[in-house]
């Protein structure tokens, strides 16, 4: 199976509500989305509200493996929030990530065709 799962614990200077945090995650657009790079996922992050998601078998291929799935967002006693993140280690992490970097470098003018 492919898939990297991360348990993430976060603090904020000003703690947002859970709903505000979910909205920010779902609406995030980085340079790849703004530049509409060919390999970039349309929506980089998907939030899954089910208690048992994300799961590798069900969610690793989100946006053809180039997106990130986040779920199980909860308030935490030591941190503001905790959640589980999932990405595809081969597509997003290696091969697809390298292609996306090359597309970004080309879009920014660092790489030109001869």
PLM region spans:
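C-terminal substrate-binding/catalytic lobe of Rossmann-fold NAD(P)-dependent oxidoreductases
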Residues: 1-82
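Generic C-terminus detector
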Residues: 80-114
């Amino acid at each position: 199976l492919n898939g990297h799962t991360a348990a993430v614990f976060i603090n904020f200077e000003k703690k947002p509500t859970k709903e505000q945090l979910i909205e920010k995650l779902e609406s995030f657009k980085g340079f790849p989305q703004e530049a509409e790079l060919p390999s970039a996922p349309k929506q980089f992050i998907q939030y899954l509200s089910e208690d048992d998601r994300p799961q590798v078998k069900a969610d690793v291929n989100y946006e053809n493996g180039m997106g990130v799935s986040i779920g199980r967002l909860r308030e935490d006693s030591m941190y503001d929030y905790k959640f589980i993140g999932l990405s595809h280690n081969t597509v997003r992490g290696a091969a697809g990530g390298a292609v996306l970097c090359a597309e970004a470098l080309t879009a920014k003018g660092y790489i030109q065709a001869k």
